[in-house]
Amino acid sequence: TRRFQQYLVDLFSAVEFDQVEVSAEIYELLIGINSTFTDNKHLLNGKINDVDRKKVLDRLGLAGEQFRSGIYKHAFSGDRATVRTADLVKFFQLSLAFIDHTIAANRREDGLYHAYNLMTAGEDTIEITHLYEMLEGQVAVLSSGYLKPEEALDVLVALRQSAIYTARQNSYLLYPDRELTRFIDKNIIREADVERSALLKALVSAGDRSLVEKSSEGGYHFNGSLNNVVSAKKAMQSLKENGYAELVDQDESLIEEIFELVFTHRQFTGRSGGMYAYEGLGSIYWHMVSKLLLAALENFQKAVADGSDPVLIGRLADCYFDIRAGIGFNKTPDNYGAFPTDPYSHTPGFAGAKQPGMTGQVKEEVIARLLEVGVSVVKGSITFNPFILRKSEFLSQADSLGYFDVNGDQQIVALAAGQLGFTYCQVPVVYSLAEETSIVLHYADGTRKSIDGNSIDADTSMQIFDKKGVVTQIEVALKPGLE
């Protein structure tokens, strides 16, 4: 969300027009959200309390509810409203301020960031409590654009030192592994909690087991038929009708509190907290690790662009390659549990990689590798800037690059020592080491074109994107970003 909001700020700050048209319904929703943020902007000066949080969320929820119900009942009217682009930019900037305040509030003492929180709504309050640390939260904050390079480094270092890291695969779990409570250790009410409740003591004394019972070993347990707090409330309602009305009225809230202390249903997160495979306990979810890889690379790129301290840049590079070293293609089949170059969904704590092909990891890997070799598109022009490419990746001896061209024909390009080859839009790109950057384009008609600098013009780039077959090879002489 933050990243897209920043993109919108940049986009609408640069456009040449000064107003846009939106549907009347979207306009009213925008007004509702913007007025809520504007009226509560003062809350950003400190910590937002539970009462103010409820007020803000109620107003935001009402704006959304009115928009949704209006569309459901009447569909879009077709009416249009005009919004000044300057006002849109102000709205996006204000929403960014609230997002940034939220991110800052979720920083943990250990330098990591909370990912998912629990929300408890009261009559006039909304209370926030935190769950355990999660890899997804660190990826989110690293990808958001919120952190300065030195702050990104702090997160990456803290993550490596956290319980999320597993030396077994030199990689990162979705969340720290833990032992589940044994079945016989569940549904145990502490004696001190029983002593707090006159109702529970009265029921135990009377031998009434509809809500609570005392075992032969002296332990206290809720009735086994109660599967959630709603069923516990129904049991208390029945007790009201059977002579316990005064005690139920007195202790109902306390019983609900004790029930949650025993079962912690509010913290139930599905398979992540109750299974040992897939995205469960002790599992590495490889798509999230590759998202972490890409996020680390983007923060390295930002540090370079900002002209950050070389030591900081070097440490960010170390963090990136440390994450990269834990990904499958760097491993032996024995360690990975499968062919290392094949994409797999996850690796449970008790076995090798599982679910071949079931992953979005490939997408992040492709993006990260293109960034590694320095290929990007700037204003329509293919540009080569290998800011994190290591000199050690260039060949130490002659080899060849096999590929399929735009016509589907298999081709081979010879590579000499000191070169590196890959394809882009099915066109072979051959890097050679040099102090100054230059490009040579090979055309299908046998001609060549030399270019000073690191960019191919937009028209030629479009021919490459469209796979016209006009350009058959790209030679780039350059200096890699790292040794």
Regions picked out by a protein language model, each given a short descriptive name:
Residues 2-483:
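Acidic, mature catalytic/reactive cores of soluble proteins
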